[in-house]
């Protein structure tokens, strides 16, 4: 999994990416959010489910807001909050390519792409590691 850091610059209340043009305007913004990490390689899954953990530790993170937004004509925002085991699930997501964002106050947000496909390996899941800090 290749991870790159994208730093947000706040100009007159507008969010602008310093490195790329990943669309985040429709996603929820944490009150303390200043750093967003991007996972470059897309997750390929049969359904949108997975786990969020603390970076470099197996400690699950509860209370992480995971949002996905379709590309093209399917711009509907779908969301889930990770449970005490760090697990989340968004039901009824049709096949396609989606942007995602994981956010929790006090942590650096994570963005990336996921591909929902019936051809994905069984048991495939989204695995997100979040860094402490804003």
Question: Predicted regions span which residues?
Answer:
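Beta-strand-rich domain onsets/edges
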Residues: 19-47, 53, 129-133
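Structural motif
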Residues: 50-62
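Short amphipathic beta-strand segments in non-cytosolic proteins
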Residues: 64-79
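A short, solvent-exposed loop/turn motif at the edges and junctions
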Residues: 75, 101-114
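Short, surface-exposed beta-strand/beta-hairpin micro-motifs centered on an aromatic residue
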Residues: 83-92
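Short strand-edge motifs at loop-to-beta-strand transitions and within beta-strands
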Residues: 88, 124-126
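A glycine-anchored, Pro-Gly-centered beta-turn/N-cap motif
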Residues: 94-97
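Short beta-strand edge segments in extracellular beta-sheet folds
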Residues: 114-121, 129-133
């Amino acid at each position: 999994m290749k991870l790159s850091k994208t730093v947000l610059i706040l100009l007159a209340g507008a969010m602008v990416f310093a490195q790329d043009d990943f669309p985040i305007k429709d996603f929820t913004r944490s009150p303390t959010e200043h750093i967003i990490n991007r996972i470059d390689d897309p997750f390929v899954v049969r359904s949108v489910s997975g786990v969020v953990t603390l970076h470099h530790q197996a400690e699950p993170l509860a209370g992480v807001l995971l949002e996905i937004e379709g590309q093209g004509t399917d711009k509907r925002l779908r969301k889930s909050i990770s449970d005490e085991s760090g697990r989340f699930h968004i039901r009824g997501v049709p096949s396609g390519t989606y942007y995602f964002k994981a956010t929790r106050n006090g942590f650096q947000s994570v963005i990336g792409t996921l591909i929902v496909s019936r051809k994905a390996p069984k048991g495939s899941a989204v695995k997100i590691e979040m860094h402490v800090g804003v």
